[in-house]
Amino acid sequence: MERPDLSTIPLTPGVYLYKDESGRIIYVGKARCLRRRVASYFRDVSALTPKTVAMLRHAVTIDTLSTTTEKEALLLEASLIKKHRPRYNIVLRDDKQYVLFRIGAKHPYPRLEIVRKARRDDGRYFGPFTSASAARETWKTIHRAFPLRRCSDRAFGNRVRACLYHHMGQCLGPCVNEVPSETYAALLEQVSLLLSGRSGELVDALRTEMEAASQGLDFERAAVLRDRIRALERTVERQAAVLPGGGDLDVVGVVEVENGLALGVLFVRQGVLLDGRSFFWPGLGFAEAPELLWSFLGQFYGPQATIPPRIVVPWLPDEDGETGDALDGSSDAVVPVAAATTIDASLADVRTGTEVTSLINASHAAPNVGESTQGDTLAGATGKGATHLMLETALAALRGGIVRIALPRNPAENRLVDMAMSNAREEARRKADTPLQDLLARALHLAGPPHRIEAVDVSHTGGRNTRVGMVVFEDGKPFPEAYRTYAFEDGDGDDYGTLAAWAGRRVESGPPWPDLLLVDGGRGQLAAVVRAFEECGMGAAFAVASIAKARTEEGRADRRAGNVSDRIFLPGRANPLPLRAGAPELLFLQHVRDTVHDYSIGKHRRARAGAALTGELQRVEGIGPATARALWERFDSLQAMADAGVEGLAAVPGVGRARAAALHAHLVTFFGSSKQGGHARTALQRKG
């Protein structure tokens, strides 16, 4: 690519996009000053890495997008990389939102929620956790030990009698009972201590309270506290204190393995190791390690992420005079000899995969006083590069407080970096032992291994209660946290139209995008989905295939695994792929197909059962879906509605006396009241 006219490029923060001759974006970068950043690519070509040279050889034009602030540039870059997946960018494929625990502040009796987005409100957040299923198990354990309310605010406001959890002793029942606010607040404070990692402190306090209750002959209260302590001790066993002095930080480790680069990140809150995650990029080498580190930090922390005040990294890459966010990572800056030696040594040990944090400490020993950390001292000595400063500024704006990206400052943080590197190495080894993605790539003619696979299926009964189920597999394993259900209005049972409508809604939901989308159906379903994505401008964003079920002689679907008649279709290809019966890739695709089929039909059956009960209410003139939902939130069954009488029904918001009288007459006539025999009672279970 020829050097562009730099006078046309603004001196503002923003994003630059290299494009090839077809107009496709092949690289996205951010800059504090766009003109200086672009100019740095054409100063000394001999200093560029082969990857950067290849990118410039394929690039034909460069576009720039100015932003007002560095934070906007960071967010725009991450958004464009996720959307376009440029060929020469390092793309973080696993960009899902992790789960958090949240305790609200506005309600007089707040509940403990599991959320995926941290809002800037008065609520308290705890996390992050990578596994939603593990978080739900923790949530259940907490509720068994601490009787907090579980119902939504709307259900709380409409409830007239205590729920089942109250009768089980797992809820104080503030919706119907007078619960002192200080009693409930004390429970919330105990839960906060547990989620903050101060479990030992909480157990000691509860044990003291239990002994006091026992001495006061309140044995029932002492037994409750004893059970709570036992539940907590089982939970505490799973928590590991890794920073004796406490503190919130994320720790990143990078290591080069035989066939790529791996990165691990650990989440430490209040000195306790909460969780971690590892990633692997095949095909990357030693030269891309600096870019990988900066690119990961830029993409991993988004507007809804929980950003700690300190992010520990294994080394601080050299940067050029502008940003250092180019692919080459070359440096024109003057670096003191001692600092350069440490950086070069630590980066070299990324190549060998050895733990290097002790070397960093040995070369830059500094007293651990307050926030004057070793990493910060080193950054100050060398002069933080522009990418470093830009990331800190942008992340601080997102967090609403100071964020430091620095080297480990003590032996405890050194061990955490080593742990992150070890986890990353294990992740790379695990994926290297799983060649299934390579088999799929060859069989389906994909550009690369499909790390994320989404599969969809339509389920309905004569066009009613239509549900499209979507399941997700990552690296060959189900990822239930990402499963989704899409509901559609009743229609004529047009699967093609439903799939096309689903494609539009999938585009609206945004990334992460799959590497492969598998449709349960034949050529017709495949064509409908492909056409819909093309109309949304997503025609080439990812690969699409369909799997058509085999048929018996009677024409019914035959779902036997490995059936030779199962057919795989690709867009633009009339004939199915000639996959060998029993081949691992075919068996896997059949497993994915069966998973999405079972998931979709299960959601449809649940919707159909709920509609049957709600439909009974809507047979009464004047009662629509909204009123039916309000009634179900107040009552457990149709029989309970009949027993409530006109006054009880009229008390539900939005019902009114006239509709209450009509509904009561219908229910009593059809089902009878509680005094008229209970033959119908067993059939009228709670909705859904």
Swiss-Prot record:
UniProt-annotated location(s): Cytoplasm
Gene3D superfamilies: 5' to 3' exonuclease, C-terminal subdomain, GIY-YIG endonuclease, UVR domain, UvrC, RNAse H endonuclease domain
Major subcellular location class: cytoplasm
GO BP terms, alphabetized: nucleotide-excision repair; SOS response
GO molecular function, one term: DNA binding
Any one Gene Ontology cellular component term annotated for this protein: cytoplasm
Keyword flag DNA repair: yes
CDD domains (alphabetical): GIY-YIG_UvrC_Cho
Domain UVR: 200-235
Pfam families: GIY-YIG, HHH_5, UVR, UvrC_RNaseH, UvrC_RNaseH_dom
Keyword entries, A-Z: Cytoplasm, DNA damage, DNA excision, DNA repair, Excision nuclease, SOS response
Domain GIY-YIG: 11-90
HAMAP family assigned: UvrC (MF_00203)
Protein family (similarity comment): Belongs to the UvrC family.
Its job: The UvrABC repair system catalyzes the recognition and processing of DNA lesions. UvrC both incises the 5' and 3' sides of the lesion. The N-terminal half is responsible for the 3' incision and the C-terminal half is responsible for the 5' incision.
Subunit structure of this chain's protein: Interacts with UvrB in an incision complex.
Protein name: UvrABC system protein C
Taxonomic placement: Bacteria, Pseudomonadati, Thermodesulfobacteriota, Desulfovibrionia, Desulfovibrionales
